[in-house]
Every structure is written in C-alpha cells, then in structure tokens.
Amino acid sequence: MIYSGDVQRIEPAPVAGPAPLDVAHLILAGFDRHYALFRYSAQRAKSLFESGDWHGMQRLSRERIEYYDMRVRECATQLDSALRGSDARTADGSRANGSAALSEAQTAFWQAVKQEFVGLLADHRQPECAETFFNSVSCRILHRDYFHNDFLFVRPAIATDYLDSRIPSYRVYYPVAEGLHKSLIRMVADFGLAVPYADLPRDAGPRLASDCQIQVLGSLFFRNTGAYIVGRLINQGTVYPFAVALRRNPAGQVCLDALLLGTDDLSTLFSFTRAYFLVDMETPAAVVNFLASLLPRKPKAELYTMLGLQKQGKTLFYRDFLHHLTHSRDAFDIAPGIRGMVMCVFTLPSYPYVFKLIKDRIDKDGMDHATVRRKYQMVKLHDRVGRMADTWEYSQVALPRSRFAPRLLEELRRLVPSLIEENGDTVVIRHVYIERRMMPLNLYLRHASDPLLEVAVREYGDAIRQLATANIFPGDMLYKNFGVTRLGRVVFYDYDEIQRMTEMNFRAIPPAPNEEAELSSEPWYAVGPNDVFPEEFGRFLLGDPRVRQAFLRHHADLLAPQWWQACRARVAQGRIEEFFPYDTDRRLHPQAAPPPRAAA
C-alpha cells in the first residue's frame, strides 16, 4: 500500500503477463472494431436504399443486432489468451462467476485496468458506448460481487453533454437569408443520395413558415424501405420537431413522401415497437442529445436503443432504474391482469415497466425455457412493424429485498425458484425481461366507451393483419396478450406462442359427417401441429356483443381461412409490405399511391 498525502491507495502488485494499460488497450481495440462495423452497416444501408434492395436492408438490420455480442465474445476470448499464465487471471479462466474472491493483487489489477481505460477515453468520440463495452467484457471475467463502480462503469466517467463530431452532428439553414424554398431544397440535396429525386422543387413547396432557422441531423435515418430526415425548426425561441420521410417510387426515384410534425408524430417514428434505425454517427451522444430536445418524454435509454445501440440503451436504463429506486419507496408487486401460463410478471407501480421471468414449470406442451428465449430473440431480430414491444434482457440483477411485497416474494419462490437467489438484504434475479408497461387490452375494452372501444378493436385487427404480413402469427390472440400504448396503439407483447406465417397451415373446418360428430366436444377431423382454423377465432374472441359488432364491421375477413391463406402466399413469395409510421394526412402528395395501411 502507498500513502499519497493522507490518502491510502492500492498500487497493483507486479504480475506476470500484460499490464493494466495493455488490457485496457485490448478492450478498447475490441470496441473500436465493433463500432467501425456498426458505422459501416449504416453506410451500407444508404447504398441499399439507393438501389431499393429491401431484402438486403432487412438482412443487414438482423445481422447488426448480433454484432455487439459477437465482438464481446471475441474480445473476452482474446483477453483470456493474453492473461493465460498471468496472476491477474481469475481462478476459473475467462469467467469468475461462481469462483473464489479476487486476491488483493487481482483486485488492484482490475481496478487499475478501469483507471487506465478512463485515460484512453479522453479524446474518444463514443466514450459512453466504450464504457458499456468495457462492462460487457468485464462481466464475463468478474464475479457479480464485483459488479460495482470500482470495477465497472456503473456511473459514467466521461461526460458527453457537449461532445460532438469533428464535422458537427447537425447542419443549420437560414431561410430568411436565402428563401425557404431554396433552403429546403438544399437541406434535402445535402444528404447526397446517389439516386435522382422525382420532383424536389415540387416536394419542397412552401409548406412551412419562412421566419425560422432549420437544424437537421447530418445523417439519414434508414429503416426498412424508408429514409428519414430528422430536425427541428426554431422560430422566435420555440422548437418545432419535424421529420421528412423519403420513399423510392416505382421508377426508382426518391420522393419526399410525408412531413411529420410535433412530438407525437416523432414519438411514433421512434416507437419501441419498431425496428432499430441504421444511422451513421461518429458521435452518438450528440445525436441522442439532439433527439432528446425533440422528444423530452422519451428516455435516452430508448433513443440509444432505437439507434441500434441497444447495449448502451440497457446501460442507461439500468442507471435510470437504480436512480429511481433510490428516490422512491413503493414496493415491487404482482402485475395486474390475468396471470400467464409461461411468465411470472411483476411491476413497480411508480415505474412504467414490467419485469417478466420465465416460470420453472410451464404448463404448455412442448414449451420450455430455451423455447421461450428463442421466441423472444426471434422478436428482437424481426421487424416489429409497430406492433410488438421491444424488450431488454438482463442477467444477475440485484434488487433490495425490502422493496418486494411479501406476496410477490412468495410467488417468486413458488414459481421461479431457479431464477432467484436471496442473499441477505438482496434478491438476485438470474434472468429477466423488462418491457414497457401498457394497459392490457382486455382491461381497456372492459371499461372503454363505445367510440374508444371501436377504435381499439379496429387497432387490434390491424395489429393482427400487420403482424401476419410481416410473417408473424401471434398464436394466442386473446386480448390479454395485447396492450394499449399512450397514443392508443394496440401492441402485441406475449411471444411464447408466436410462429412464422410460412410455418402455419390455415384450413377451413370440413363439414361434419353426422349430427353426433357436430355436437361432440372432440373434432371430427385430423388436426396437425401447425394447423389453424380461423373460423374458430370468433368463439374465443367475440363473446362481448360490443366487441363482436365492432370486429365484424372492420375485420370479418379474419374469421375465414381465405385471408390467411392469401397472406401466407404473399409472404412465402418474399413480398415486403411496409407499414409506415404515419397516416395519409401527413403525406405531402396524398394523391400519390399511399403506403400500405399506415398507422399513427
């Protein structure tokens, strides 16, 4: 031990193998490789949009989601090799979870690694993401007892409030000086798409007031078949968020398709129910800070996630969650609604999220932990078309035992004993999914007025249609498996029974051979494992007369196999139908061919 003034500090003891600075360099190099590939995927998205390669865009979006874990595993393997034979290597190699505590020398070594890593981030453009990568690699090495700020970045070490790219993250236009029309044309042309515009002067017509300043993020936001310009108008001190949607027409030209105005329009664009954007960002913190000024209600954790930086979103969510726990006193309790057969769900009333644990014993044939986790990963990798809630997945989450309601703790002990560990004043959850809390649709319909019920039932049917068109069959379509968002959108959130449409066989019920068969509780026809009979849906879904009338007005065709068979055939042919996150009244030229069944 060394004393510096009156402060006692531990110097890492000399060990065989790499020094702490070497380890810090290795981890940062792993992150830099990851982020270079991340940016390259956004640059590829631009060329895919220009060429209209929508299947390539979907494939790229799926592949990018897995980049991070691949780079973390790669870096942890390199680190394990570098530390082989070193005193700093933990007792069981690349993982210390379940191993003995670190020695004093190992403790000093790993603390020094973090200190050296902080020094390397002084001029880095993605320091917050690099810190998260450091955490991910370290969590593969250290026991959870060391998951605190001495070893990990539980709190950020580098401030990003005023961090920006070498080339500023947004451009500014002054329509008072050069005219609104010219400013708008230049704003769009500056993105440098290598494909002609259909009629840019027409599209950029005088739709806006002229006495304003326009600030636009310097990169396009690509998702599926669309690209978006995101910015803000500042006029006499008031900020007006906006986004411009770009689409390719059948001739291969780019059109300005829609103008989205205000926080509700942009909140829908950046909804947690949609696929992540592909955006080229040198400095993601600058982009997120800009977006936060447009969407003050949306947590930065969600913004990072929607930009494809879902691990950084997880880090920020966890920090926000710990901060909320410190400044609240209510207890975790069983979530309201009908109990599920697969998940044990609880909530913290003061926090707008639910916590979902897979039950130890699942009372469904062919269903186990691995199957459920595969289904959730399937949703993570899939285009959620605005109809499936995104989730955050966590392991080894330590929560204060005093914050658990007694009935919840008893339920966890009974239903998920393998996923919890009670350790003194702490309850450790070994695996949990966290997602946005929504009003369950069954509860919403029970109390809704006739006009609101009509809208909700129409939304419910639209959700089923759009999921099917995106090659997702919900499986269990009961109302309890759907939720209603703040903006009244119906979203599916129970994934254990989802299947791909192309795996299903939609059939008509054959005529009964006789009256006895028709009255029997057993089917008189053979049923395969993936057979679905849409004629049966009404029996389970339409018991409420109000719901039945509304459903038949808007979605009667969903009760017959023909619609499902036609949809399955289109999906099997590889057709991509886009459901844009805006209504037709946001379109600049409503007379043009509308995007398929857009939704606000």
UniProtKB/Swiss-Prot annotation:
InterPro entries, per the entry: AceK_kinase, AceK_regulatory, Isocitrate_DH_AceK
Listed EC numbers: 2.7.11.5, 3.1.3.-
Keyword Aminoacyl-tRNA synthetase assigned: no
Keyword entries, A-Z: ATP-binding, Cytoplasm, Glyoxylate bypass, Hydrolase, Kinase, Nucleotide-binding, Protein phosphatase, Serine/threonine-protein kinase, Transferase, Tricarboxylic acid cycle
Main location class: cytoplasm
Molecular function as annotated in GO: [isocitrate dehydrogenase (NADP+)] kinase activity; AMP binding; ATP binding; phosphoprotein phosphatase activity; protein serine/threonine kinase activity
Positions contributing to ATP binding: A335, P336, G337, I338, R339, G340, M341, K356
Active site: D390
One Gene Ontology cellular component: cytoplasm
Superkingdom of source: Bacteria
Location of this chain's protein in the cell: Cytoplasm
Reactions catalysed: L-seryl-[isocitrate dehydrogenase] + ATP = O-phospho-L-seryl-[isocitrate dehydrogenase] + ADP + H(+)
GO biological process: glucose metabolic process; glyoxylate cycle; tricarboxylic acid cycle
Function: Bifunctional enzyme which can phosphorylate or dephosphorylate isocitrate dehydrogenase (IDH) on a specific serine residue. This is a regulatory mechanism which enables bacteria to bypass the Krebs cycle via the glyoxylate shunt in response to the source of carbon. When bacteria are grown on glucose, IDH is fully active and unphosphorylated, but when grown on acetate or ethanol, the activity of IDH declines drastically concomitant with its phosphorylation.
Family: Belongs to the AceK family.
Name of the protein: Isocitrate dehydrogenase kinase/phosphatase
Organism: Bordetella parapertussis (strain 12822 / ATCC BAA-587 / NCTC 13253)
Classification of source organism: Bacteria, Pseudomonadati, Pseudomonadota, Betaproteobacteria, Burkholderiales
